[in-house]
């Protein structure tokens, strides 16, 4: 898979959907909206547009200073799946800070990982693309980030 390239772009040249996606993320981070549906309604953005851009558009300051990222996974319940996931995260140079796994129900489990990316040897999107290739990972997304 091709490595992702990032660009620094002035806000006034971004399409409306991307600017509004950033507004929705800000509302959710600051608890000014109770849900994604509430936030997109406040900024007049479709939910599909928000989900299209939410993992692709970030304020510049977050790309510079963020070192802790929380990831959410939906996994098939297989022996060794969590171990393989954690090994891939460790191989990227990330440090696992916390792990939360639900009890598997109907062959599926949810896992939330908080990782430190300060020593990471690749960017978070490259790691996410590698993780998506595991056949036992049904879903991976960034839940949040912080310093």
From Swiss-Prot:
Gene3D superfamilies hit by this protein: 3.30.70.260
List, alphabetically, the InterPro entries matched: ACT-like_dom_sf, ACT_dom, UPF0735_ACT_dom-cont
**Which residue numbers delimit the ACT domain?**
70-145
Q: What Pfam families does this protein map onto?
A: ACT
Give the family from UniProt. Belongs to the UPF0735 family.
Name by which UniProt lists this protein: UPF0735 ACT domain-containing protein RBAM_024960
Species of origin reads Bacillus velezensis (strain DSM 23117 / BGSC 10A6 / LMG 26770 / FZB42) (Bacillus amyloliquefaciens subsp. plantarum)
């Amino acid at each position: 898979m091709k490595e992702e390239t990032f660009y620094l772009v002035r806000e006034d040249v971004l399409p409306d959907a991307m600017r509004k996606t950033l507004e929705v993320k800000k509302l959710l981070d600051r608890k000014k909206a109770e849900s994604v549906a509430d936030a997109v309604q406040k900024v007049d953005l479709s939910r599909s547009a928000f989900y299209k851009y939410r993992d692709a558009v970030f304020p510049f300051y977050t790309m510079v200073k963020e070192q802790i990222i929380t990831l959410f996974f939906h996994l098939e319940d297989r022996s060794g799946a969590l171990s393989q996931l954690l090994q891939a995260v460790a191989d990227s140079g990330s440090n696992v800070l916390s792990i939360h796994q639900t009890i598997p129900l109907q062959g599926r489990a949810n896992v939330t990982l908080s990782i430190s990316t300060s020593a990471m040897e690749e960017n978070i999107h490259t790691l996410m693309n590698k993780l998506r290739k595991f056949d036992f990972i049904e879903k991976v997304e960034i839940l949040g980030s912080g310093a």
